[in-house]
Amino acid sequence: MAFYNNIAVFEVALALCAYSWIFGGTMGPMLVPVMPWLALLMLEALLCFPQKHSAETTFEARTRVWSRLKKDPLTWTILAFFLYLALPFLNKGLCEVCDYPLIAAGADPRPPIPFLPFCVNRMDQLGIVLWFVPTLVAVLTVKHALLKSGKRLLLHIVVWNGFLLAIIVAVQSATGAKGPLWTDLGADASYFFSTFGYPNMAGDFFTTIFALGFGLWRRQLEDIESQLKEEGRDKLKQSHTFFWKKHYLLIPTAVAYFAAINTLSRASIMLVTLIGLVMFVHTATCMLMKMSRPRRFKAGVVGSFALAVIVTLSLCAMPEDVQREVDTINTGEVLNRMTGKGQYHVRVATSIWRKHPLFGVGGWGYRHFCMPEMTDKELQCLQTFGGINVHNDHLQFLVEHGIVGMGFLAAILVMILLPVTRQWGDLLKAARFLQPKQRPPLPLQIFVLPAPVFAILLAAVATLIHAFGDCPMRSPAILSMFFVSLAAMRGFMPSTRHS
C-alpha cells in the first residue's frame, strides 16, 4: 500500500535519475526514446495517482489535485510555455552556414512567419523540448501530487542517486574507462567525469547533491531530537543508540563534496567549499544556541579546533591537480568568466540577440548563427570543443528564446518560490512573539527557515552564479534538479496560514 501511495514520488525520481544517467541529458538523440514516456508517466501519476492523506480516498485525492491544478496560475503559465516551445516546429527558417547551398540557389532564409518564434533545426528544438517538458511536468507533480513526506522522500532518492554517480567515478578510474559509463562518447578520453561528458557540469551537479545532503542531514537530526523528547528517554543513551540513524546521510554528503572537488572545475571548487563553510557556520550557530553556557564554550572551542585542523589538512594534503586549479583562481579570472571579457561568445551572442530580441533564434540556434557574426580574427581562434555554447546560460537562453521565453522562465520561477516566501513571512512574524530562549538565532531572516530549505536555496543560488560563467544548466540533469528541488521546499516548511 505504501508503494502505491508513493507512485508519483518514484516516477518523478525516475525522470530525474534518467537525466543524470543518460550522460547528464546532454545527448539529445538518447533522450528521444526515454523522456517522452517518463513525462507521460509523471502526468498519469499527477492526474490519477496522487499521494493520499491518511483519511482520504483515491477519488478525493484526485479531486483535490485536479481542483488545485485548475486554479494554479503556474499550470497555465507552464502550458503557455509549452505552446511557445512548440511553435518553432511549424515555423522553420534556414541557417546561413548549414543551408548555404539552398540560400545561394535563391531560397529565402527567413521563416514563413517572421513575427513568430522560429528555429532552423527541428531536432535541436526537440532537444530543448525534452529538457523542459519533463522537468516542468515534474514540478507540477511535486507541487500538487506529493505530500510533504513525498517531497522529502524524493530528495532522499536524488541524494542517494548522486552518491551512486560519485561511486561510479572511482570504478571508472580503477578500470581505466575511456569515456562516461565506459563508452567512447567523450570528446576527450581525459575530459569526462562520472556520466557527464563535461566535468564542469558534473561539478555543479555534485555541488547541488552536497547541499541537498547537508540539508537532509540537518533535518534528520531535528527529527531524532523531536522523537527523543516525545518518548522521554535518556538523551545520552539514545545518542549512542541512534548514532547511525542520525548521521548516515553524511556519507553521500561527504562523497558528493569530494566528487565536486575532483571534477577540477574551479567554479565548483569555490562554490562547494563556500556552501560547506556557510552550512558549517549555520549548523554550529543553531546547535550552540540550544546548549548551556559552559557546554557552548566547550563546543565552540572544540568546533573551532576541528575546523582549523580540517582547513590545515586540506591545504597541506591537497592533491596536485586540485592545487593546480586552485592556484589559477583570482578575482580577475572570476570576473572575466562571469562577464565574458576576453572571449568572443558574449559579444557574438549579444549581437545575435539584438537582431532577434523578442523570440530569439530557436533551440541551439546560437551555434547556427554565431559564425556570421564573428570577425576574421575570431574565426581563426574558433573554439572547437564547447563552442556551441555561450558559456553564460542566462545569455544563451535569451539569445535562443528571446525576451518572451526568458519572461516565461522567470514567471515560472517566481510562481514556484512565491508560496515559500509567503510562508517565510509568516514564520518571521511568528518568531517575534516567541520567548527569547525559543527564538532562532539572529538574523531571523536566515535562521527562521528550516535548514533543508536554506540549503536548497544556497544550491540554487550557486547554480545561477555558476551559470554566469559556464553552461551547467545546458545539462537537463542539473536543470531538472534545480526546478524540482525548489518545488520540493514546501515539504520542509512548517504549516502556516499560507500553507
Predicted regions located by residue number:
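TM-adjacent membrane-interface loops and short helices in multi-pass inner/ER membrane proteins
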Residues: 198, 343-387, 394-397, 401-408
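Short, charged juxtamembrane terminal tails flanking transmembrane helices
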Residues: 496-499
